[in-house]
């Protein structure tokens, strides 16, 4: 099924849109709920293996999210907050940590104190 030049509200429920393609489509105020979008090039969404590139998520909120194994590169997180999160095994490399605080402590101060005592 091919649609071109549509300018209407669509409601799609309980459907399989496997291998669908959306190109040059404006989707302001679109909602995706209880949706599986594996390997896509948004409550209850499976986006495992999705790729996000040149995406603006400023002021976005993520709650009850599984980001295990995620790779984050060349990302701006300035003035953000990470709260009640498991950071076990996380590595932070080659990052600007100016003003970064963990539980109220400046990380740069902690690193300086560590280096002074080794």
Go through each PLM region and give its residues.
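Tandem repeat scaffolds
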Residues: 1-118
